[in-house]
Regions:
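Amphipathic alpha-helical segments
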Residues: 6-28
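Long, charged, glycine-rich C-terminal linkers/tails
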Residues: 28-35
């Protein structure tokens, strides 16, 4: 892929992403990504990373603001974060085999030929709209899917038990008693029994059903 072809593709992708929206948040398409604001505060980003040798793109996401992040920042767990950053949630599609971003098992989308640009841009927009934007939004403003997302991939969260505690404290109706039991029995969420279970047990009175 020539530099000119790459610039053309990235400009076309930017144009396709400009109309994306999410309730309660302001989404701004920028070159190689999407920014999320809560009010005027920048709280999260989705970024496309170009891999020169592979001539392909991966998608990265980070949440570093919002009510859940602020709550998590006030408590220091007695063990290491799953993440190598200050974010409360972070992921990369590189190496993921879920095929949500790409159709291959590498988690990458090959840089398209000129005649394929339209189709690839449509595919990426659909992937963001249907999965990645709701995923990131649920880490900023808790919703019914927030707990399910943590259960699906706990290692994408700095401290998954603390994250759930803060999300439910902000919006108690997002968890049921049955779901709380599932959370408390998950070894990838409960990494330190004394600390994490004490955090989560507080939610028993808040859980519905």
């Amino acid at each position: 892929m020539s530099k000119e072809e790459r610039i053309y593709f990235e400009n076309e992708l930017l144009a396709r992403l400009k109309s994306l929206e999410w309730p309660g948040l302001t989404l701004t398409a920028v070159k190689k990504g999407l920014k999320f604001r809560l009010g005027k505060e920048l709280v999260a980003q989705l970024d496309f990373q170009y891999l020169v040798k592979a001539q392909a793109y991966t998608l990265l996401g980070r949440v570093f603001g919002g009510p859940i992040f602020e709550c998590c920042s006030k408590i220091v767990p007695p063990y290491r974060s799953n993440l190598g950053s200050d974010a409360c949630f972070s992921f990369t599609t590189s190496g993921r085999q879920d095929k949500r971003f790409s159709t291959n098992v590498y988690g990458t989308i090959s840089a398209p030929e000129i005649e394929e640009v339209g189709a690839v841009c449509s595919h990426i927009r659909a992937a963001l709209e249907n999965y990645y934007i709701p995923l990131v939004a649920g880490c900023i403003l808790p919703s019914q899917r927030t707990i399910e997302d943590v259960l699906a991939s706990p290692t994408d969260y700095a401290y998954p038990a603390l994250f759930i505690r803060c999300a439910v404290a902000f919006k108690p109706e997002i968890i049921s008693k049955e779901k709380l039991k599932e959370v408390m029995s998950n070894k990838k969420i409960v990494k330190n029994k004394d600390f994490d279970l004490s955090l989560l047990s507080v939610l028993e009175d808040l859980a519905v059903g």
